[in-house]
């Protein structure tokens, strides 16, 4: 069994949206996925608890219980445990990262979200975990051209220390429509743009965790880490040291 921790150090980034949609996408692709809601806000539970299959696939938990839950899920035959992590305190975020095979930091293309992504990356790298960053709630391209804010976010995150997923999730009303019905975007419109993005993101994450046709996860800038003149992540994002 593999474990994915979906992280954000600030509210509003869409961490729960990503976690829930990835879990339901996995199940749609015949991966036996379960979700652990370790966020005290219990947003994932609010969305999913009315589903017929919620029992056995959705768990309310806390950071201190994640290791035991992971062991129980593995014994039950699950293929994938997705953790909707708390935003704080840092110790709880770290506990979630420790039990994960891969940490997925969620960030919108905004100054404060990028700053929070740097803090998430710091925890992931300090613990020696594999990780990546996904940009969420991005404005869609116009006439095939990415909005400047999205381009700048991708450029800034090149220096954050972890790779950025090639698929960004766009700001679309269907996410809220789906949540209001306790469903995923794939269940609302399986042929829509949002569904395609979620499927692509899940396959990228799943292949990364299972080692399918991928080299070990490392930042494209790994070979620059020995160079003293490389800007720090906070400097690259225009943040104070």
Task: Label every PLM stretch briefly.
Residues 89-111:
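Inter-motif core of Ras-like GTPase G domains
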Residues 112-137, 141-159:
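Anionic-ligand binding region
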């Amino acid at each position: 069994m593999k474990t994915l921790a979906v992280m954000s150090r600030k509210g509003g980034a869409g961490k729960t949206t990503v976690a829930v949609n990835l879990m339901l996408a996995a199940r749609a692709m015949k991966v036996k996925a379960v979700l652990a809601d370790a966020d005290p806000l219990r947003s994932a539970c609010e969305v999913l608890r009315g589903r017929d299959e919620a029992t056995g696939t959705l768990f309310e938990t806390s950071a201190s219980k994640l290791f035991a839950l992971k062991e129980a899920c593995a014994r039950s035959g699950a293929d994938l445990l997705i953790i909707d992590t708390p935003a704080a305190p840092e110790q709880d975020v770290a506990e979630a990262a420790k039990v994960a095979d891969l940490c997925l930091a969620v960030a919108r293309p905004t100054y404060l979200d990028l700053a929070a992504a740097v803090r998430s990356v710091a925890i992931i790298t300090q613990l020696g975990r594999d990780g990546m960053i996904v940009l969420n709630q991005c404005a869609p391209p116009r006439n095939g051209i990415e909005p400047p804010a999205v381009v700048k976010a991708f450029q800034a995150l090149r220096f954050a220390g972890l790779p950025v997923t090639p698929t960004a999730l766009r700001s679309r009303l269907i996410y809220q429509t789906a949540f209001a019905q306790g469903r995923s975007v794939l269940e609302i419109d399986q042929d829509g743009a949002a569904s395609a993005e979620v499927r692509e993101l899940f396959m990228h994450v799943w292949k990364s965790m299972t080692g399918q046709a991928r080299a070990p996860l490392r930042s494209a800038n790994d070979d620059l880490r020995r160079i003293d003149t490389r800007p720090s992540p906070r400097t690259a994002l225009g943040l104070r040291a």
